Amino acid sequence: MIPRYRAWIKSLKWMCDVTNISFDSKFVDICQQGDTERCTEMSVEFDEIKLMQSTGLKDKNGKEIFEGDIVDYKGRKALVSWHGSYASFIYRFVDELQKRNAEWNPLYLAYMRCEVIGNIYENPELWEVNG
């Protein structure tokens, strides 16, 4: 599998598809999200963006799941992230994130029952805990 990425441009508050990453020069080539076939690419520096990797999985509606996405799983909001110690994408329920020992779950066991409802950058209200 070739890893896919998307990027959040901090200053523009804009989500885009990543078409190329240059680790030597620390630049990322981007296109408007969903329009990589006919877009005009531009390059941005690493420190101008938040880079998010695709999990390689799709939700129950066939939508690609990226780290930073917020999914609905059995009526609860959960954040998708990378767990380095276990080399796996996980989800943690948003209402438990403030707990010191918040439970995490491997995404590969639940992705077909999840639905992507937004992400932490474009939909910060989903990130908030009510109560």
Regions flagged by a language model, labelled:
Residues M1-G131:
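Secondary-structure transition motif
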